[in-house]
Design a protein with these regions (language model features):
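Active-site metal-binding loops of divalent metal-dependent hydrolases
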Residues: 49, 82, 250-252
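Active-site phosphate-binding/coordination module
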Residues: 60-162
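Short active-site oxyanion
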Residues: 73-77, 97-99, 184, 244-246, ...
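Short, structured coil segments at secondary-structure junctions
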Residues: 94-97, 105, 204-207, 264-265, ...
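Non-catalytic pre-domain segments flanking phosphatase-related domains
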Residues: 1-47, 71
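Mg2+-dependent phosphoryl-transfer enzymes with acidic/Ser/Thr/Gly-rich catalytic loops
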Residues: 16, 33-34, 38, 42, ...
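Hydrophobic packing residues within well-ordered alpha-helices of enzyme cores
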Residues: 62, 87-91, 197, 201, ...
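Conserved acidic, metal-coordinating active-site core of Asp-based
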Residues: 140-249, 253-260
Length: 302
């Protein structure tokens, strides 16, 4: 890349959009002082609605901003409700290889297994017996689509859904979903709204598990007491990072747990502007929307 060049003071130079982007990145990179070392942060980023848009392209500026944070010595990782199969590609695209990755809303923590390649292994898993929850939900949502994730990463599902990544997944009868302990249950009911799901879980009570309602009619259920925050506390401890040196960014109800964890420890919790009000209320700060590059804005300020 060519050396950053600014036009003389008082003049205006019109350049192509990509040239402008490259110029901003060059100037930002040159402004970084490698002689100034700060204590590293543990930065945990949600994926959907935080670093990527609905079409799974990256939020503006996020790739460059993650690189900026990495150059500053911070540990940038992902904490997502996705399975590992739906997460791996984003590590490669961001060009990061953190020591740990939190998936399945905290029920599975993966650890890097090879220093030279992007290879990870399941390091810690949480499971529960799904039979009571599945039976209860089926009574109220007989037409919903169900999927469970097992401790070894395999997934079992009842019906295909277009936006599900079904690598390492098998279609089975509903009764087979509860044949062994699971890390999580995913329920999708296209005929219901997000508010319908919120009201349903309040009405029937899901007291023996943790759960989060997605921005569509999507219910994600994990073992009791397990969320992104509990998983990140394990990661923080393993890495030996000060509890106050954490920064988490997300947009959904499944991010509230890690928001609370960060704030209770004196860290930072940042919600995306387009998230539900209850999510923004749970965070200590609100950045701009994913469409406007909210994550990049936060990371560039470090």
């Amino acid at each position: 890349m060519s050396e950053a060049h600014l036009p003389p003071t008082g003049s205006v130079e019109v350049v192509p959009e990509q040239t402008a982007v490259d110029l901003v990145e060059d100037v930002a990179r040159e402004a970084e002082d490698p002689g100034i070392r700060t204590e590293p942060l543990l930065i945990a980023l949600d994926i959907d609605g935080t670093i990527i848009l609905e079409d799974e392209t990256f939020s503006p500026g996020v790739v460059e901003a993650v690189a900026h944070a990495h150059r500053a010595g911070h540990e940038v990782m992902l904490a997502t409700g996705r399975s590992w199969e739906g997460t791996e590609e984003f590590l490669a695209s961001l060009n990061i290889a953190p020591e740990f990755v939190v998936t399945s809303n905290g029920a599975i923590i993966l650890r890097k297994s090879d220093a030279d390649v992007l290879a990870y292994e399941r390091f810690h898993t949480e499971t529960f017996d799904p039979i009571e929850v599945l039976t209860l939900l089926r009574e109220h949502l007989p037409d919903a689509k169900y999927m469970v994730e097992l401790a070894d990463g395999r997934r079992l599902y009842t019906e295909h859904l277009g936006d599900w990544n079904l690598e390492h997944a098998d279609r089975v009868p509903f009764e087979q979903l509860s044949s062994m302990p699971v890390c999580r249950i995913v329920v999708v009911s296209p005929g219901d709204t997000e508010q319908d799901f919120v009201e349903l879980v309040e009405r029937i009570g899901l007291n023996e598990v943790s759960y989060a309602v997605g921005w569509t009619a999507w219910l994600d259920i994990a073992p009791q007491g397990v969320d992104k925050g509990t998983a990140l506390e394990r990661v923080r401890s393993w890495l030996g990072i000060d509890p106050a040196r954490v920064l988490v960014i997300g947009d959904g109800r499944n991010d509230v747990g890690m928001f609370r964890w960060a704030l209770e420890n004196g860290g930072r919790a940042v919600a995306m502007e387009q998230g539900p009000q209850e999510v923004r209320d749970a965070a200590g700060e609100v950045t701009t929307s994913v469409q406007a590059g909210g994550v990049a804005e936060v990371l560039r300020s470090l």
